[in-house]
Amino acid sequence: MKKEDILGRWRIVDWRQDYDDGRSSYPLGQALRGFIEYSAHGMFCVIEKTDRPPLSASQWTASEADKVAAYSSYFSYAGGWEVEGESDRGTVIAHHVEHSLYPNWEGGIQRRTAQMRDGLLYLSARFEDGTPEARSAHLIWRRDA
């Protein structure tokens, strides 16, 4: 897969995590909205639950419970990106994270294995290997019209 094949905006279809111990989960549930966009200038990803309640006050004065609920129903990150090459599982895409809701990713590289099938973009990644939370994340995206 070439960089040109990936360029553009893709809408989220599904996000599932499969744990090494056999569990599966949907981090933000199964009713999602959002997109990932790849351009010549960088990439941006945002995913959120479709039923996010509004905060009971302004973003600065909302209760801690409201802030936790908002954080737990939304995910985003942005930065540069490149196609690193091919692996036995697909094309390796490196996301050079400059900004993230999850600050631990900032300044790092998030690698995704990409495949294109039936007009859909499949991105997969491994997380927390060697821990009880070791898992594979699988995201499916449809090109935006």
Q: Which residues are covered by each model-predicted region?
A:
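Lipid interaction determinants
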Residues: M1-A145
